[in-house]
């Protein structure tokens, strides 16, 4: 029975028993404290807690889940996995214990021909809570052997949310896999032989003061009792398919088979390799499912977890001997295995897979660089101590400079028997974060958000934002703050202050839109220039000002006036951003979703999700589409409505942003050509924007692209500068504008030919110097024959390398030989290349060590292998000094 069919059979059974079948919720958790949906009951928590009314009192689902807490254990055992599916049936104040037990028993033991799973009743075992004799009796009434029912305490068989709320005893169902898997005695004796497949939670208590699973206070019985159950689909699948573990099921094992083909190895022949196979199978599936729900690789939150899954996959395949790209094989394999359960995977697979492949390419480059640097750090640690530890500074440099994750550093170091000073690494990371926080807080002129929290608690009513309709307003000063002093009653200028008004037309920076600027004038004569407006905490609008004249006091009546020209320019940019977003989606598809933006006077920046560079024709089409709509002068309207109604209309919203029940929808065009949830300011007709020119499109990270554009006056100014530049070039090159490209290409071709001839001349000069150098070195009576030469300009780096290796070959192996050539490359930077023969290496002379010393003299660095290394610097005047130092060091051996 396929996994998809096992799930369908479960849902069909409960649909027959009047349950509303709901689709799986997204893997992206609605709870801000968790990254992913980690349990089948998570989407139902509002109903279980009594916070919302369920659409029906009986419901069932197959919920996608991801848990990465034990990610390091994945593969080491066959029980751990990051992605899993949880079947569940729920009752919210409807049926209770007896029906839940009956449903579970009936579905498990009814024959497969009659719609059940066909488990042998003699192989089923139950656990109940110590005091729950009622559940025990109900199981016996269903036909369970009393000897197959075991009691467990609160640690195992009492469930709570982890805090105040519903709770109650649970009963777990196990399958006996037989004596080949462990000893007799039921789940209490051996949970490897007896595998848990289903947990029935009977929520009949209200609990609080939950300190641990065994330390809590039962307040009393719930008025409405709930049923919350969870059956692990993967466990059911491997038992019903006659397999030994989750990795051998139909939705997982195909990835292992694909990895076998890529590596040429066989699963089941070597435990170390098997661990890697299992890591790959699990992580590929998890990554595919996470990405299909909209997550993309990044350095924070869910994106970081995803990035780690993909990178562990690539690294595990490397440890299986595969250095070529692997995801183009593994991702389609996993999709094919999963699409019977999730046909929607096909809708986004092209964009998802391109993003994953791009992440693999980037990581392969990181891995090559980082591995070399880590090897140096590991070797250094081994040479310094009998109990080697990689310095925390080295681990931090790998992470900060080369993007090498600490988890990978720890893993790779451990494989070589070396520890990492993780405490020092964490200390350096904390220092870096502290610096970043301090920089961010400078913008708020305060370093302690509690000042704002304390002030907000004193507000009698919310601050009224008037800026959608009013450009100036009468207001009252209700708060004044100064850096280092917090809230103050009055300030005399000149001074930098933060001012809070009871009502304001000033827009605070949010949603990518920059803040308004302007002035605040008090009736008492105080003059304030408003430079910025921020919301340091929710619903608190803070004006960051320069008090240039007078004294400002709390309670003062003021006129607040925004800079109309700036507001208009920003509004034009913001509306243009919506239009660019819409046009991009028209050209690229619905996967091109917003990841960020900045709306500034006369310019915009728009970040969107896309895995590779769009064709230039696509960007041109986007620009043309936007300007066509500008000429149509579409109307821009705003309307507040319920969030669900807005989404039903097709309104776009920011990924990961939290919205209230009532949202503001900005629509462009009577037919809603563009609709977005947005709290920003906009023009009333797009014709007022004037023009949009897209200046550039580029990658800013894995799977994220950025468009920069100029808007309105910015676009007109740009076109004027472009016209002037074209005119200047036409005059200088004596060509019409339409001839410029051809003329420039001809000049570049001439320059390239000149460079080629120059490089050829340098190489000829370099080659001509070899015979004399070889002859002089052979005649040397020194125990170590050292050939050094300042070759001057040598052209391409490869020419220097080839010459060094050629000289080494001609000098042979009769004695230790070191060849060191230095000169100036195409960029006029000094470089040195060193080669050693086998006799020199046996004498302890390493090319890498010699290069590092010479490059240091040149003001740079370098390294390489014992037989060949190269490096460079910045001070070409010290080439002779560097070679002399190198020669002296080589002859010391």
UniProtKB/Swiss-Prot annotation:
Q: Which CDD domains match?
A: AlaRS_core (cd00673)
Tell me which residues bind Zn(2+). 574, 578, 678, 682
Annotated catalysed reactions? tRNA(Ala) + L-alanine + ATP = L-alanyl-tRNA(Ala) + AMP + diphosphate
Tell me the domain of life: Bacteria
- What are the UniProt keywords, alphabetically? Aminoacyl-tRNA synthetase, ATP-binding, Cytoplasm, Ligase, Metal-binding, Nucleotide-binding, Protein biosynthesis, RNA-binding, tRNA-binding, Zinc
Major location category of this protein: cytoplasm
Can you quote the record's cofactor note? Answer: Binds 1 zinc ion per subunit.
GO biological process terms, semicolon-separated: alanyl-tRNA aminoacylation
One example of the protein's molecular function in GO is: aminoacyl-tRNA deacylase activity
Main enzyme class: ligase
Entry cofactors:
Zn(2+)
User: Cellular component per GO?
Assistant: cytosol
* InterPro entries found in the cross-reference section: aa-tRNA-synth_II/BPL/LPL (IPR045864), Ala-tRNA-lgiase_IIc (IPR002318), Ala-tRNA-ligase_IIc_anticod-bd (IPR018162), Ala-tRNA-synth_IIc_core (IPR018165), Ala-tRNA-synth_IIc_N (IPR018164), Ala-tRNA_ligase (IPR050058), Ala_tRNA_ligase_euk/bac (IPR023033), DHHA1_dom (IPR003156)
E.C. no: 6.1.1.7
Pfam families with a match to the protein in the record: DHHA1 (PF02272), tRNA-synt_2c (PF01411), tRNA_SAD (PF07973)
Member of which family? Belongs to the class-II aminoacyl-tRNA synthetase family.
Protein function:
Catalyzes the attachment of alanine to tRNA(Ala) in a two-step reaction: alanine is first activated by ATP to form Ala-AMP and then transferred to the acceptor end of tRNA(Ala). Also edits incorrectly charged Ser-tRNA(Ala) and Gly-tRNA(Ala) via its editing domain.
Q: What is this protein called?
A: Alanine--tRNA ligase
What is the phylogenetic placement of the source species in the record?
A: Bacteria, Bacillati, Actinomycetota, Actinomycetes, Bifidobacteriales
């Amino acid at each position: 029975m396929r996994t998809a069919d096992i799930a369908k059979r479960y849902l069909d059974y409960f649909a027959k028993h009047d349950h509303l079948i709901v689709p799986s919720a997204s893997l992206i958790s609605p709870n801000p404290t968790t990254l992913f949906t980690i349990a089948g009951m998570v989407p139902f928590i509002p109903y279980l807690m009594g916070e919302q009314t369920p659409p029906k009192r009986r419901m069932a689902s197959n919920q996608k889940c991801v848990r990465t807490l034990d990610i390091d254990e994945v593969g080491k055992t066959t029980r751990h996995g990051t992605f899993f599916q949880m079947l569940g049936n729920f009752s919210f104040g409807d049926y209770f214990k007896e029906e839940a037990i009956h449903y579970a028993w009936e579905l498990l033991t009814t024959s497969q021909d009659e719609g059940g799973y066909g488990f042998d009743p003699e192989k089923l075992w139950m656990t109940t809570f110590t005091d729950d004799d009622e559940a025990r009796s109900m199981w016996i009434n269903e036909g369970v052997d009393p000897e197959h029912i075991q009691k467990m305490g609160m640690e195992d068989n009492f469930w709570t949310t982890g805090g105040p709320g519903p709770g109650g005893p649970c009963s777990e169902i196990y399958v006996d896999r037989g004596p080949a898997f462990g000893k007799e005695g039921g789940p209490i004796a051996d949970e490897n032989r007896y595998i848990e497949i289903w947990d029935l939670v009977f929520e009949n208590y209200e609990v609080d003061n939950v300190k641990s699973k065994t330390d809590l206070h039962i307040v009393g019985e719930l008025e409405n009792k709930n049923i919350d159950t969870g059956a692990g689909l993967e466990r059911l699948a491997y038992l019903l398919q006659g397999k030994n573990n989750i990795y051998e099921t139909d939705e997982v094992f195909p990835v292992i088979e694909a990895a076998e083909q890529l590596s040429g190895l066989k699963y089941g022949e070597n435990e170390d390799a098997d661990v890697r196979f299992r890591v790959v199978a699990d992580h590929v599936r998890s990554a595919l499912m996470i990405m299909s729900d909209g997550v993309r690789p990044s350095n924070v939150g869910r994106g970081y977890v995803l990035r780690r899954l993909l990178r562990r996959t690539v690294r595990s395949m490397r440890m299986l001997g595969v250095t070529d790209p692997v995801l183009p094989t593994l991702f389609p394999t996993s999709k094919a295995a999963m699409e019977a359960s999730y046909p929607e995977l096909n809708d986004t697979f092209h964009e998802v897979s391109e993003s994953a492949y791009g992440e693999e390419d980037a990581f392969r480059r990181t891995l090559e660089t980082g591995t070399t640097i880590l090897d140096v750090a590991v070797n250094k640690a081994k040479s310094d101590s009998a109990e080697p530890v990689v310095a925390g500074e080295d681990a931090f440099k790998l992470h900060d400079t080369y993007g090498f994750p600490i988890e990978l550093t720890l893993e790779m170091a451990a494989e070589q028997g070396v520890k990492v000073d993780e405490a020092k690494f964490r200390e350096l990371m904390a220092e870096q974060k502290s610096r970043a926080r301090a920089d961010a807080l400078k913008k708020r002129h305060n370093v302690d958000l509690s000042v704002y929290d304390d002030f907000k608690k004193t507000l009698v009513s919310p601050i009224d934002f008037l800026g959608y309709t009013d450009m100036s307003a009468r207001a009252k000063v209700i708060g004044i703050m100064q850096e280092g002093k917090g809230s103050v009653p009055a300030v005399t200028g000149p001074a930098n202050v933060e001012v809070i008004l009871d009502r304001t037309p000033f827009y605070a920076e949010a949603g990518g839109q920059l803040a308004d600027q302007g002035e605040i004038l008090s009736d008492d004569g105080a003059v304030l220039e408003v430079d910025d407006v921020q919301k340091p905490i929710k619903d608190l609008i803070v004006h960051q000002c320069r008090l240039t004249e007078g004294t400002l006091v709390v309670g003062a009546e003021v006129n607040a006036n925004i800079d109309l020209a700036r507001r208009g320019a920003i509004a034009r940019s913001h509306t243009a951003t919506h239009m660019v977003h819409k046009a991009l989606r028209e050209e690229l598809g619905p996967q091109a979703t917003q990841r960020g933006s900045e709306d500034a006077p006369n310019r915009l920046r728009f970040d969107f999700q896309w895995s590779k560079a769009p064709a230039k024709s696509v960007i041109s089409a986007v620009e043309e589409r936007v300007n066509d709509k500008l000429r149509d002068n579409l109307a821009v309207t705003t309307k507040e409505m319920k969030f669900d109604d807005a989404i039903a209309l097709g309104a776009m919203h920011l990924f990961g942003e939290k919205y209230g029940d009532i949202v503001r929808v900005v629509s462009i065009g009577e037919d809603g050509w563009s609709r977005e949830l947005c709290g920003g300011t906009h023009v009333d007709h797009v014709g007022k924007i004037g023009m949009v020119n897209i200046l550039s499109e580029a990658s800013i990270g894995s799977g994220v692209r950025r468009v920069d554009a100029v808007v309105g006056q910015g676009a007109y100014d740009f076109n004027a500068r472009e016209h002037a530049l074209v005119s200047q070039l036409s005059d200088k090159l004596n060509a019409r504008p339409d001839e410029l490209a051809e003329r420039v290409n001809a000049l570049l071709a001439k320059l390239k030919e000149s460079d080629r001839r120059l490089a050829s001349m340098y190489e000829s000069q370099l080659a001509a110097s070899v015979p004399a150098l070889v002859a002089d070195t052979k005649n040397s009576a020194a125990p170590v024959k050292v050939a050094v030469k300042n070759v001057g300009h040598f052209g391409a780096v490869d020419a220097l390398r080839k010459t060094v290796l050629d000289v080494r070959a001609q000098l042979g192996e009769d004695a230790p030989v070191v060849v060191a050539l230095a000169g100036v490359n195409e960029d006029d930077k000094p470089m040195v290349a060193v080669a050693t023969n086998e006799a020199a290496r046996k004498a302890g002379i390493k090319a890498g060590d010699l290069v590092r010393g010479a490059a240091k003299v040149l003001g740079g660095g370098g390294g390489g292998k014992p037989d060949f290394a190269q490096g460079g610097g910045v001070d070409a005047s010290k080439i002779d000094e560097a070679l002399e130092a190198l020669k002296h060091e080589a002859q010391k051996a």
